[in-house]
Amino acid sequence: LKNRLNLLKIISIILLYTFFATGCTENENNKKKPKEYTHFYPSERITSDIDRHETVYVPVYSHVYTSDEKYELMGITLSVRNTDFKQNMWIKKISYYSTQGELLESYVSKSHELNPMASIDFVVDLNDIRGGSGANFIVEWEGSKTLSNPIIQAVMVNNSGNKAFSFITNGENLK
Protein backbone atom coordinates (compact mmCIF):
# COMPACT_ATOMS: atom_id res chain seq x y z
CA LEU A 1 0.00 0.00 0.00
CA LYS A 2 2.85 2.37 0.85
CA ASN A 3 4.48 1.74 -2.53
CA ARG A 4 1.20 2.51 -4.30
CA LEU A 5 0.81 5.80 -2.42
CA ASN A 6 4.37 6.80 -3.29
CA LEU A 7 3.78 5.87 -6.92
CA LEU A 8 0.55 7.94 -6.97
CA LYS A 9 2.41 10.90 -5.46
CA ILE A 10 5.13 10.66 -8.10
CA ILE A 11 2.57 10.39 -10.91
CA SER A 12 0.63 13.34 -9.48
CA ILE A 13 3.78 15.46 -9.31
CA ILE A 14 4.70 14.55 -12.89
CA LEU A 15 1.19 15.36 -14.11
CA LEU A 16 1.14 18.70 -12.26
CA TYR A 17 4.58 19.59 -13.59
CA THR A 18 3.53 18.69 -17.14
CA PHE A 19 0.31 20.68 -16.80
CA PHE A 20 2.06 23.83 -15.54
CA ALA A 21 5.01 23.51 -17.91
CA THR A 22 2.82 23.24 -20.99
CA GLY A 23 0.46 25.95 -19.76
CA CYS A 24 3.32 28.44 -19.44
CA THR A 25 4.90 27.92 -22.84
CA GLU A 26 4.26 30.45 -25.56
CA ASN A 27 1.95 29.47 -28.38
CA GLU A 28 3.92 29.18 -31.64
CA ASN A 29 1.28 31.23 -33.50
CA ASN A 30 1.61 34.18 -31.10
CA LYS A 31 5.38 34.59 -31.38
CA LYS A 32 6.58 37.72 -33.09
CA LYS A 33 8.41 36.94 -36.28
CA PRO A 34 11.31 39.13 -37.32
CA LYS A 35 10.48 41.43 -40.20
CA GLU A 36 12.85 41.11 -43.12
CA TYR A 37 11.74 43.37 -45.93
CA THR A 38 13.40 43.43 -49.31
CA HIS A 39 10.44 45.20 -50.89
CA PHE A 40 10.39 48.28 -48.59
CA TYR A 41 13.64 50.11 -48.10
CA PRO A 42 15.08 53.59 -47.48
CA SER A 43 15.55 55.35 -50.78
CA GLU A 44 16.70 58.66 -52.14
CA ARG A 45 14.42 59.41 -55.05
CA ILE A 46 16.55 59.46 -58.19
CA THR A 47 13.64 59.44 -60.62
CA SER A 48 12.18 62.67 -61.97
CA ASP A 49 8.78 60.99 -62.55
CA ILE A 50 7.48 61.99 -59.13
CA ASP A 51 4.72 64.49 -59.74
CA ARG A 52 2.07 63.22 -57.35
CA HIS A 53 2.08 63.86 -53.59
CA GLU A 54 -0.75 62.57 -51.39
CA THR A 55 -1.59 62.68 -47.69
CA VAL A 56 -3.98 60.00 -46.41
CA TYR A 57 -5.90 60.04 -43.10
CA VAL A 58 -6.69 56.58 -41.66
CA PRO A 59 -9.01 56.45 -38.61
CA VAL A 60 -8.15 53.72 -36.09
CA TYR A 61 -9.33 52.62 -32.65
CA SER A 62 -7.08 51.31 -29.87
CA HIS A 63 -10.31 50.49 -28.04
CA VAL A 64 -14.04 50.52 -28.77
CA TYR A 65 -16.73 51.23 -26.22
CA THR A 66 -19.30 48.56 -25.41
CA SER A 67 -21.11 50.82 -22.92
CA ASP A 68 -20.51 54.20 -21.27
CA GLU A 69 -17.76 52.87 -19.03
CA LYS A 70 -16.67 49.59 -20.63
CA TYR A 71 -14.46 49.10 -23.64
CA GLU A 72 -12.64 46.37 -25.54
CA LEU A 73 -8.98 46.75 -26.47
CA MET A 74 -8.08 46.47 -30.15
CA GLY A 75 -4.85 45.48 -31.86
CA ILE A 76 -4.27 47.66 -34.93
CA THR A 77 -2.56 46.80 -38.22
CA LEU A 78 -2.02 49.59 -40.74
CA SER A 79 -1.54 48.23 -44.27
CA VAL A 80 -0.15 50.20 -47.22
CA ARG A 81 -0.50 48.37 -50.56
CA ASN A 82 1.07 49.44 -53.82
CA THR A 83 -1.50 48.27 -56.37
CA ASP A 84 0.57 49.19 -59.43
CA PHE A 85 1.98 46.32 -61.49
CA LYS A 86 5.04 48.22 -62.75
CA GLN A 87 5.81 51.32 -60.70
CA ASN A 88 7.30 51.81 -57.26
CA MET A 89 5.79 54.26 -54.82
CA TRP A 90 7.56 56.22 -52.09
CA ILE A 91 6.32 56.41 -48.51
CA LYS A 92 7.57 59.70 -47.08
CA LYS A 93 6.04 59.56 -43.63
CA ILE A 94 3.77 57.42 -41.45
CA SER A 95 2.69 58.98 -38.15
CA TYR A 96 0.36 57.69 -35.43
CA TYR A 97 -1.73 60.25 -33.49
CA SER A 98 -3.90 60.01 -30.37
CA THR A 99 -7.51 61.10 -29.90
CA GLN A 100 -6.13 64.40 -28.56
CA GLY A 101 -3.99 64.94 -31.69
CA GLU A 102 -0.71 64.12 -29.94
CA LEU A 103 1.96 62.47 -32.11
CA LEU A 104 2.57 59.06 -30.52
CA GLU A 105 4.86 57.31 -33.02
CA SER A 106 6.69 58.06 -36.25
CA TYR A 107 6.85 54.73 -38.05
CA VAL A 108 8.49 56.18 -41.16
CA SER A 109 10.27 59.52 -41.03
CA LYS A 110 12.31 59.46 -44.24
CA SER A 111 11.46 58.27 -47.73
CA HIS A 112 11.11 54.51 -48.27
CA GLU A 113 10.47 52.83 -51.59
CA LEU A 114 7.69 50.22 -51.93
CA ASN A 115 7.96 47.83 -54.86
CA PRO A 116 5.12 47.20 -57.35
CA MET A 117 2.32 45.01 -55.94
CA ALA A 118 4.06 44.97 -52.54
CA SER A 119 2.54 45.72 -49.14
CA ILE A 120 3.89 46.94 -45.85
CA ASP A 121 2.25 46.82 -42.43
CA PHE A 122 2.70 48.52 -39.08
CA VAL A 123 1.27 47.15 -35.84
CA VAL A 124 0.02 48.84 -32.68
CA ASP A 125 -0.16 46.16 -29.99
CA LEU A 126 -3.45 45.22 -28.36
CA ASN A 127 -2.39 46.57 -24.96
CA ASP A 128 -1.22 49.95 -26.29
CA ILE A 129 -4.21 52.16 -25.42
CA ARG A 130 -2.45 55.51 -25.90
CA GLY A 131 -4.29 56.23 -29.15
CA GLY A 132 -7.80 55.99 -27.79
CA SER A 133 -11.08 55.69 -29.66
CA GLY A 134 -10.23 58.59 -31.99
CA ALA A 135 -6.67 57.68 -32.98
CA ASN A 136 -5.41 57.98 -36.54
CA PHE A 137 -2.53 57.44 -38.91
CA ILE A 138 -1.30 60.00 -41.40
CA VAL A 139 0.43 58.46 -44.43
CA GLU A 140 2.32 60.70 -46.84
CA TRP A 141 3.30 59.09 -50.12
CA GLU A 142 4.39 60.09 -53.60
CA GLY A 143 4.86 58.67 -57.07
CA SER A 144 4.08 59.22 -60.71
CA LYS A 145 0.73 60.64 -61.83
CA THR A 146 0.19 57.35 -63.68
CA LEU A 147 0.72 55.26 -60.52
CA SER A 148 -2.35 53.22 -59.57
CA ASN A 149 -4.03 54.41 -56.37
CA PRO A 150 -2.62 52.51 -53.40
CA ILE A 151 -4.93 50.88 -50.88
CA ILE A 152 -4.29 52.17 -47.38
CA GLN A 153 -6.43 50.71 -44.62
CA ALA A 154 -6.34 49.55 -41.02
CA VAL A 155 -7.62 46.37 -39.44
CA MET A 156 -8.59 46.38 -35.77
CA VAL A 157 -8.87 43.00 -34.01
CA ASN A 158 -9.57 41.59 -30.56
CA ASN A 159 -10.26 37.88 -30.19
CA SER A 160 -9.59 37.36 -26.51
CA GLY A 161 -12.01 35.54 -24.28
CA ASN A 162 -15.27 34.31 -25.74
CA LYS A 163 -15.84 37.43 -27.88
CA ALA A 164 -14.22 38.53 -31.11
CA PHE A 165 -14.21 41.96 -32.71
CA SER A 166 -12.76 42.82 -36.10
CA PHE A 167 -13.30 45.67 -38.51
CA ILE A 168 -11.55 47.64 -41.25
CA THR A 169 -11.23 51.37 -41.89
CA ASN A 170 -10.17 52.87 -45.20
CA GLY A 171 -7.83 55.80 -45.65
CA GLU A 172 -9.16 59.07 -47.05
CA ASN A 173 -7.12 61.54 -49.10
CA LEU A 174 -6.76 64.92 -47.43
CA LYS A 175 -6.94 68.06 -49.54
Residue ranges and their predicted role:
Residues 33-70, 159-175:
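Transition segment at domain starts
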Residues 2-11:
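Bacterial N-terminal signal peptides that target proteins for export
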Residues 20-23:
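C-terminal motif of bacterial Sec signal peptides marking the signal peptidase cleavage site
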Residues 70-77, 135:
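Short, solvent-exposed loop/turn segments enriched in Ser/Thr/Gly
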Residues 99-136:
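Intrinsically disordered, low-complexity Pro/Gly/Ser/Thr-rich segments with frequent PxxP/GP/PP motifs
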Residues 87-94, 105-106, 149-152:
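Short, hydrophobic/aromatic beta-strand segments
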